[in-house]
Amino acid sequence: MDMNMDGKTVIVAGLGVSGQSMMEVLGSRAGRVLGVDEKKPDADLHSFDQIDWDNTDMVMTSPVFNPRTPFILEAQKRNIPVMSEVELAWQLRVNSNTTGKPAQWIGITGTNGKTSTTEMTSEMLTACGLAAPAVGNIGKAVSHAAVDPANDVLCVELSSFQLHFTYSLELDCAAITNIADDHLDWHGGIENYAADKAKVFHNVKKALVYNADDERVTKLAFAAQTAPECRRIGFTLAEPKDGQIGVKDGWIVDMSGIAGGEAGKPFQVAKVTDFTHLTEPDGTVYPHLLADALTALALVLGLGADKDKALAALKQFTPGGHRIQTVAVAKTSDGGTIRFVDDSKATNAHAAKASLNSFADKSVVWIAGGLAKGSRFEQLVADQARTIKAAIIIGKDQQPMLDAFKASAPDIPMSIIDPTDNDTVMARAIDAAGTYAQSGDVVLMAPACASMDQFKSYADRGNQFAQQAQRWVNEHGEA
């Protein structure tokens, strides 16, 4: 793709974090840059109908716009290139001050686990003395990072939205954490969704890291065309096979050779109990966070970083907020507790399943619901019915979750929170949960849905959960 922008007119669609960054990066590189955003007063254009297509050379699009959006279809009909911020960043890479070559890129995608894995990867590489910021879908614009010569490595969280309009990535290391139904309304189906995720594996140079416990990801990994020297490294929560890193007898064990041992022979890397950042107060290690750590470790060692420094950083890493985090604890009269756990970042069924799987049978009062994004939940409820003691249904799009319980677990008690008052929804949900919770139980908010119907973001939803949980604990004293 020709990225010579001299004298060209570029449209930037959507002026959020990535859009604003593209406007700034393109300002000194293109002939004319016009931002389009219906909600931003300072946008150059406030309607896509205002675009002068006859004098437009390129379109940079925000992830919010799906491929069937009219302005995208119009651009494609006119053979005007449409690309993501990630594609722009890749095309505009500058040489690093350290090496005189473009910064290495590590790309991380998947339905769940992207953010934690990206953060872990960044922290380990930073501990190894590299300038390795976490950028991309994680909230920090990749286009600014790509044109900053101070960076040695970019740890890029990549969403399927970003990858759809990305064409030429050839990453140094790449990982797909897992693939499950999500954003199907945007992509038009699971096959399109998986195909966009698979773009990270194309022509990977050093290490292709895949979830060996996920059949779809494994197939994509072995179907991918890579550089001849690239190693395929599977991660698993079971005993690893040749070419994998996994868990055996309380140890992280490498069978791929990336950790210093011989490929095909077990090499003990670290004790699982070393990873206190992955545990709750009772010492429980959450399996999905351990999987994220294995992914990040494989990426970092696959890049060639120092193992000891990387492990030291990983052992001290603390996950970000709203990821299966205990936010309040009520003491009960029998000396036990009721825990309130915020996993607001579990915005799809796959993430909610991982969260529910972390707890004992019939111990979870589950707060679920929100924007379903075209997903169905029958299988999730069927699989996790053994764990769920009661369900509290929030959100404006309640029917998919209600249908799932009716079909898969009709005997589980349920409270439905009236969606008409957004300001009190979480308070009412917590109060309802409190009527079911007893000693030893967990009130878990892992909604399996997006948050924007009733909250500003998943973080806002999590913060409100924490506030209302603490309010309930304060009001009830000993439950």
Swiss-Prot record:
This is UDP-N-acetylmuramoylalanine--D-glutamate ligase. SUPFAM superfamilies: MurCD N-terminal domain, MurD-like peptide ligases, catalytic domain, MurD-like peptide ligases, peptide-binding domain. Its EC number is 6.3.2.9. Keywords: ATP-binding, Cell cycle, Cell division, Cell shape, Cell wall biogenesis/degradation, Cytoplasm, Ligase, Nucleotide-binding, Peptidoglycan synthesis. PANTHER family: UDP-N-ACETYLMURAMOYLALANINE--D-GLUTAMATE LIGASE. Belongs to the MurCDEF family. ATP binds at residues 110-116. It is found in: Cytoplasm. The gene is murD. Pathway: Cell wall biogenesis; peptidoglycan biosynthesis. It catalyses: UDP-N-acetyl-alpha-D-muramoyl-L-alanine + D-glutamate + ATP = UDP-N-acetyl-alpha-D-muramoyl-L-alanyl-D-glutamate + ADP + phosphate + H(+). One of its GO terms (cellular component) is cytoplasm. GO terms for biological process: cell division; cell wall organization; peptidoglycan biosynthetic process; regulation of cell shape. Pfam families: Mur_ligase_C (PF02875), Mur_ligase_M (PF08245). Cell wall formation. Catalyzes the addition of glutamate to the nucleotide precursor UDP-N-acetylmuramoyl-L-alanine (UMA).
